[in-house]
Amino acid sequence: MLLFYMVRKENQNMKIKRLLAAVLSLAMGVSMMTACGSSDSSSKAENDSSATENTQKHTNDPMTVTTAKDLVAQMKVGWNLGNTMDATGSGLDAETSWGNVETTKLMIDQVKDAGFNVFRLPVSWGTHMDENYTVDEAWMNRVQEIVDYGIDNGMFVILNTHHEEWYMPKKDRADKDVEQLKALWKQICDRFQGYDEHLIFEGVNEPRLRGEGNEWIGDAESREVVNQYAKAFVETVRASGGNNPNRCIMVTPYAASSTKQNMEALEVPQGDDKIIVSIHAYLPYSFALDTAGTDQYTSIDSSITTLFTDINEVFLSKGIPVIIGEFGSVNKANTEARVQCVKDYLSTAKQYGVPCCWWDNGTRIGNGENFGLLNRSEGGWYFPEIVDAIMETVNS
């Protein structure tokens, strides 16, 4: 607990140092303006040193995994840093704008030490891009810093685009959406091209008709546009430099839906053995996701078995590996039931060779979706029984 306090204190001191450096830099810039021209932006001044360190850290790491199936076989279980870099505010303060504390390496080390070997990093980019789709340098640097927390301790890191409100899967918006999607992923690819197979790109997160009556079901048109997103994403990554032509990447059906209709509608690129399908499934729904639903779980639910038989039929049987990018159950003061559910869920997933990533949004109490496991402020786990059940199941 003390160590977490010290890390937070160190982060505060670093922020003060960066602020002082920025003030001094600005003062020097004003005094030398006639000789040197206008000064750099404060965000760039604050991040120059970290940018240099980060971008030079993984410039040409050798790739060793040959196919997506080989890669997925090495994954045990994953953890999401939810409601953090995916918050939709602007500037670096967005990281903590939804109530979570600033991410530290110590947090991610603790996740790894608990037994998770996959770290999914949800990131929202839209509010950090200008009118030319250029990503703010300071935001890119911070994303890379957190990516390195996982990469440097041997975890697989899934980097995505998350709460993006600039795309809507409709035909009349598809061209503009694809243009921005390509521009964004080109920049991400350029920054991370030297990383090895431990870094996985995930094109979009739950692409859907936000706010509409069929938001989570979709229709033929929206499913087709989602396929256009996937195609543009894959083409952009494969056309970029470094290790990206051989990188394992993830595509998703409409809304990352586990319904058979939406999974069957996904057009997985042919002839590319480094493609993984991402599915989200909080099951059984009334227990796992519906905050007004039941808090009871006594035996394996048919929705769990149906999920994996459908995944097997649509993807696995055709040689296409799958990752459950998000799963979990909300806290309803029912830890014993949650333990049993996670055991059933993961034991079934293990039978099919599908690794799963728990959605941890940092919240454990209240009226909302309380998926939090890690106590990010003080260290330790809110529900160690659930973490133990996860590890017992995936390691059995």
Predicted feature residues:
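Active-site region of glycoside hydrolase catalytic domains
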Residues: E179-G293, L307-V330, Q351-Y352
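An active-site-proximal structural segment forming one wall of the substrate-binding cleft
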Residues: D61, G99-F119, M129, Y133-H162, ...
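N-terminal carbohydrate-binding accessory modules
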Residues: A51-V118
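Short, Lys/Arg-enriched N-terminal segments with co-localized hydrophobic residues
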Residues: M1-N13
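Substrate-binding cleft of secreted/luminal carbohydrate-active enzymes
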Residues: T305-Y382
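Bacterial signal peptide processing site
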Residues: G37-S39
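C-terminal motif of bacterial Sec signal peptides marking the signal peptidase cleavage site
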Residues: S31-A35
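Acidic/histidine-rich helix-loop elements
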Residues: L81-T103, D130-V135, R173, S286-I304, ...
